């Protein structure tokens, strides 16, 4: 089947959810009532939902069947042990704590690592800096509410939509070491390797880069946590683009990559394909003290550490989903679907970030050059796209990045992107064609799209619940 121009979806659709069609007038009223924030729309008013791929896709029949094996014991559940075995087999990590989702893991490990650094290295809490190739929004939020600065050290080409590169998600290694020295190694409680790098456009990180980051971290005795939401997509890109690993399986690449971290935090709602679930895992006995403290904190914040806020059936489903998300044919289809959408958008003159793993990222700054960054061009584009076609997408730009907690000033954003996030096994090529046609209509009226200003601005993670209005 290799000689066909386009292969169809490698699955059969057995259950469907009807969606309603709405009028332009209806959608204009809906987005206005939502405070010009697509997050606040009701899902029944959305025709194609590209807000996120987090827990919004279909699951496999094997995952559904696994739920019936659930052991709902409060402690010592056999479903927990099934999940822990899967983690050890796939990642090589000894210690597993389930959580309700990724941010559940973050709210546990971040304060524990800060406390450990303070106790062992004399960390100065007034000078704390955590580093990443690019923090996911909730990771940044949890870092900041623990009074730690979140600093991103990405490469120069990462946000340049005019540049093609194999691994645009990589750390800038020189900037990483410079940032460590500027803060003082004792004041860096952790480094987060985000794979794939969501905010840069779902761009992958090479094993060579992960290894180099880990070597730098070990030099200064700084723990590395792998933000693992899209670990399988990252492994697929490594297989396709990093010469040394072209003949390796996804499973082999994954095991190799996770040698270069001390722990992992995962929103399992992405590559593990579940609707709800997360993981916090540590590699070996060198982090047993951290694991022990995290288990204690888990009881307070998530639940007993052998269920972590998940029912037994959900842990069984997650154990299967970790494997199902690594299937070669599945990953090839998923990455090709994103590439098809990006190519279609660029064919009509809509500039995008290089095709990445889970979404097409439209360069809203170039599509709406008349809207300045402080009026959130990508968010304005999201509102216009909804008005035109009922498509919900999400801004990855100045609105998401937020303000400097110390000064209150808007953080400078390297790019104003609109993320069209594709849920797993949910939308077909016909949907992609509809999205492309919708952008043709948006592009024709682009000069009339207005910037936005706040009517309500939350202090943290403002993009989720902010309310805005169009500038006069």
Swiss-Prot record:
Tell me yes or no: is Cell wall biogenesis/degradation among this UniProt entry's keywords: no
Tell me the residues on which N6-(pyridoxal phosphate)lysine occurs: 270
**Which cofactors is this protein said to need?**
pyridoxal 5'-phosphate
Pfam families in the record, alphabetically? Answer: Beta_elim_lyase
Q: Which reaction does it catalyse?
A: L-tryptophan + H2O = indole + pyruvate + NH4(+)
Q: Which family does it belong to?
A: Belongs to the beta-eliminating lyase family.
Protein name (record): Tryptophanase
Please tell me the species this chain comes from.
Answer: Vibrio cholerae serotype O1 (strain ATCC 39315 / El Tor Inaba N16961)
**What gene is behind this protein?**
tnaA
């Amino acid at each position: 089947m290799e000689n066909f121009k386009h292969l169809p979806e490698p699955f059969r659709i057995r259950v469907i959810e009807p969606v309603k069609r709405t009028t332009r007038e209806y959608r204009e009223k809906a987005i206005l009532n939502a405070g010009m924030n697509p997050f606040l729309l009701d899902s029944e008013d959305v025709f194609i939902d590209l807000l996120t791929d987090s827990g919004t896709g279909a699951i496999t029949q094997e995952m559904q069947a696994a739920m019936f094996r659930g052991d709902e014991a409060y402690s010592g559940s056999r479903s927990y042990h099934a999940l822990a075995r899967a983690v050890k087999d796939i990642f090589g990590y000894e210690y597993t704590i389930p959580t309700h989702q990724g941010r559940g893991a973050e709210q546990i490990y971040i304060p524990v690592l800060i406390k450990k650094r303070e106790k062992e290295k004399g960390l100065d809490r007034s000078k704390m800096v955590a580093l990443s190739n690019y923090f996911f929004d909730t990771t940044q939020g949890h870092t900041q509410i623990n009074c730690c600065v979140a600093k991103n050290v990405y490469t120069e080409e990462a946000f340049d939509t005019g540049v093609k590169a194999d691994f645009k998600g990589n750390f800038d290694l020189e900037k990483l070491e410079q940032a460590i020295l500027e803060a003082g190694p004792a004041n860096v409680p952790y480094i987060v390797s985000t794979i794939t790098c969501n905010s840069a456009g779902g761009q992958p990180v090479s094993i060579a880069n992960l290894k180099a980051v880990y070597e730098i971290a070990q030099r200064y005795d700084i723990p590395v946590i792998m933000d693992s939401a899209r670990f399988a997509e990252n492994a697929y890109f490594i297989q396709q683009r990093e010469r040394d690993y072209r003949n390796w399986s996804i499973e082999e690449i994954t095991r190799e990559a996770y040698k270069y971290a001390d722990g992992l935090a995962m929103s399992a709602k992405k590559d593990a394909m579940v609707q709800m679930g997360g993981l916090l895992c540590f590699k070996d006995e060198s982090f047993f003290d951290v694991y022990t403290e995290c288990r204690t904190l888990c009881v307070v914040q998530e639940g007993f550490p052998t269920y972590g806020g998940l029912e037994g059936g959900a842990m069984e489903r997650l154990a299967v989903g970790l494997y199902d998300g690594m299937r070669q044919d599945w990953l090839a289809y998923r990455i090709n679907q994103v590439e098809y959408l990006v190519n279609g958008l660029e064919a009509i003159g809509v500039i995008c970030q290089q095709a990445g793993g889970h979404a097409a990222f439209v360069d809203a700054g170039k599509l709406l050059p008349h809207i300045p960054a402080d009026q959130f061009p990508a968010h304005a584009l999201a509102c216009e796209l909804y008005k035109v076609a009922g498509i919900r997408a999400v801004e990855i730009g100045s609105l998401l990045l937020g303000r400097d907690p110390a000064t209150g000033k808007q953080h400078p954003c390297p790019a104003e992107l609109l993320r069209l996030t594709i849920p797993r096994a949910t939308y077909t090529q016909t949907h992609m064609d509809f999205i492309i046609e919708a952008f043709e209509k948006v592009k024709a009226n682009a000069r009339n799209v207005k910037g936005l200003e706040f009517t309500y601005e939350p202090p943290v993670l403002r993009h989720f619940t902010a309310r805005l209005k169009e500038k006069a």
